[in-house]
Regions:
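Conserved catalytic-core motifs of GNAT/GCN5-like acyltransferases
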Residues: 96-97, 189-191, 204-223
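A short beta-loop-alpha structural element at the N-terminal edge
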Residues: 24-38
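Conserved GNAT acetyl-CoA-binding A-motif
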Residues: 151-153, 180-192
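Active-site rim helix/loop that mediates acceptor-substrate recognition in acyltransferases
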Residues: 53-76, 81-82
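Conserved GNAT-fold acetyl-CoA-binding loop/helix
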Residues: 45-64, 104-112, 116
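Conserved active-site alpha-helix within GNAT-family acetyltransferase domains
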Residues: 138, 150, 155, 166, ...
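Conserved beta-strand in the GNAT
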Residues: 78, 85-94
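Conserved acyl-donor/pantetheine-binding loop and adjacent beta-alpha core of acyl/acetyltransferases
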Residues: 96-156
Length: 226
């Protein structure tokens, strides 16, 4: 699940203070874990709030956020509201193949134990069902897209609505691209919700392009790190 980040093309952050201070980008730290969980859940329904969509609100972050900050915290960056609260983040891995192997060893067993079967239906009927979400949590091979050797890194990015349109989405992506380039990674990819047309417009403005195996119902986009 990726990125629900409509953003102004080329815009620099305006003098807006959604928190107690001026928001700024900084590296992730362990104390940000709960903030990342909160942002993930509140942007996981096609860019909207996914609280109450699944039987357990921890499911989305346990598939699309927490494994990343566990495996590669050095490739996680957050927008701090100026008082320590996380308003958005970008997370990624430099080597998807290595991440998949780590996930099988270190993440799948615990995830399976915590979530052995779907919980009580909520009546929300999301397009990405709870059964699919549980399957994603134990099947990291889903990340091995055909172009993984050309685009070995991948990312997820989410911003709370209060922060969108201020240029932080672009700056987060650029920050991660620079960090990946410094590690010798040439290109990065992402998958996204086809229904999130604002996010797609954002990626197009940044220069992302469709990969060969991209499909209308499940877009795959990539970009060079430099």
């Amino acid at each position: 699940m990726t990125a629900r980040v409509p953003d102004a093309a080329g815009a620099a952050p305006r003098a807006v203070t959604p928190g107690p201070g001026h928001p700024f980008i900084r590296p992730y730290r362990p104390s940000d874990r709960d903030g990342v969980i909160d942002v993930c859940v509140r942007t996981a329904a096609g860019g909207g709030d996914a609280r109450g969509v699944y039987s357990d609100d921890s499911l989305m972050p346990e598939v699309f956020a927490l494994p990343y900050v566990e495996y590669a915290p050095e490739l996680a960056f957050v927008v701090d509201d100026g008082g320590g609260r996380v308003l958005g983040y970008v997370i990624g891995v430099a080597d998807t193949r290595a991440f998949v192997e780590w996930w099988k060893r270190e993440w799948t067993p615990g995830f399976r134990a915590r979530h052995p079967s779907p919980g009580t239906p909520t009546g929300r009927n999301p397009a990405f069902t709870e059964e699919q979400l549980l399957a994603a949590g134990i099947d990291p091979d889903r990340m091995l897209i055909a172009e993984v050797d050309e685009y070995p890194a991948h990312l997820h990015i989410d911003l709370l609505p209060i922060l969108q349109g201020q240029g932080f989405g672009r700056r987060l992506i650029d920050t991660l691209r620079e960090a990946l380039a410094e590690r010798g990674v040439a290109a990065v990819h992402l998958g996204m919700d086809a229904a999130n047309i604002d996010a797609r417009a954002f990626y197009d403005r940044l220069g992302f392009h469709e990969l060969r195996t991209s499909r209308p119902e499940s877009p795959l986009l990539g970009i060079a790190t430099r």
